[in-house]
């Protein structure tokens, strides 16, 4: 049992060590989104979600860089259990956005969800979870 726990811990630590990795390429999306080079354009009506991470309990910082010129609030939600449990959210503005998030327990299938109902495009450049 100790070996399994150590193995899991090592897996978690390797995930945490890669925290500066841009997660945009791991995101899922509906038909109202498209790739523009290495950026995901979420058009009006578009939904971006994922990347379904498994993370140990600790403090994290979610950083999202977008290009967005709209005036309507664009909200990115942090959820688990297929969106049934909302752990946090942030209003996105043009440029760099960040929130701190504390996970009290091991969290599986952690996802970041952006449903665009702003009438404008939101270009997602970078997502990190460190």
Language-model features: where?
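Extracellular carbohydrate recognition and processing domains
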Residues: 83-109
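Glycan-recognition and processing domains
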Residues: 3-59, 65-79, 98-100, 117-130
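Short, aromatic- and glycine-rich surface loops/edge beta-strands on solvent-exposed regions
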Residues: 110-116
